[in-house]
C-alpha cells in the first residue's frame, strides 16, 4: 500500500515539499494554522514567489480542474494525524529576538499538536534547521505524547533548498541526508525518496546529531566562502587589484571551485545569517565555542559590506551629506528569483541612506509588496526606468536578470548623473562605461 504523507507547515519549505511529494506520486495532506494561507493553497495559489511552484501546485491540488487531486490542505491536527504514515515537519526556526540562538517554539508547538493524534505506527520527520541535540529531545517528547508510544518514531532529514530553485532542489536533490535510529525509519525514507535515489541522488544515512550538523555546517561553509571573497575585495581595493579576476583565477582550482566567489554587499535572507549565529550560540552551550569563533568574523565581514556600500554612495555624491540627493536602488530581495526580503542587504543599504536624508527610490521585479511592508517610508517605482528618473547615483544591489539586460544608454537619459555602483559585481563595466557611465564596484579598479 502506497505511503500517505502529511506536511506540517506550508510556508516556503512546506509548500514546496508538499507539491513535490505529490509530484512523486504520493497522496499528500498539508497542514497549517493560518486560514488565509490554507485558502490560497486550496485555490492553487502560492503565498510567496518561487519559480515553478504555483504550476506544480495547480497540477496536484484537489478540486482544481485537470489536477491529479493528490494534494489537499487542512487545519485539523486530528485529520493530519490519522492521514499520514510519514509526517514532515517544515515549520520556521527564526532567530530569537535580541539573541543569536534559534527560536524552537514553532517546532515544539508542531510536535505538541501532532503527537497526541498519532494512534498507530508513524514516522515524524523533521526538516527544519535546528540546533544540534534538538532531535534527541524531540524524540523523547514524541514518545511521551503519542498514544502509539515508541511506534511513533522520529527521523531528521534536513532541507537543502535554494530559493529560486526550490522545486528542482526537492525533486532532484544533490544529496538526501537522513538521521535515523531504526531500520524501519530508514526503510520508510528510502521509500519516500525512491525516485530521486534511482535518478542518482546520494542517500546518506547517519545519526541525529550528524544530520542536524550537516545543514548548519553547509550553510556556515557557504557563508565563510562569501565573506572570504568579500575580505579579498577589501584587500584588492587597498592594493588596486581586481577581485573579479582574482575570483576567476582561484575558481579554476578544482579544490576551491567558482561558486559563491562573487564579491559584493554580502549575503542575507532567512537562512545563512540566522543559521551561523544559532550555530555559534549552540556551540557555546556545548562548550565548543572556540571551534566556531571564526564565524563571528564571517558575520562581521558580511555586515560590514552593507556599510561600505553606503560609504561608496556617499563618495560618489561628493563625500558629503545625502540630504537632497536622489538615490535609485535596483533590487529589494536578498537574492534574485525570489520575493524574500528578510535581512535583505539591498533594503538595509536603502534604509541606511534614507535615514541619513537621501531620497531613495527602490525597484524590484518581485519583491515590491514585501519591501513596502517592511520599509514603508522608502520610495518605490514600478519600473527600473521610473526608479532612476532624476537620480544622482544608481545602486545595483540584487542581481536580477532584468537588471543585467538593461540598456545603459536608455537608462542614462533618465538620470541626473550617470553614476552606477554595482553592489553585486554582476554587470559588464565596459558596456556601462561606453554608454557614458561612471562604473564602480566593490574590489574593482575605478577605471
What do the PLM-derived regions correspond to, one by one?
Residues 1-447:
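Structural/interface elements that position substrates and couple domains in central-metabolism enzymes
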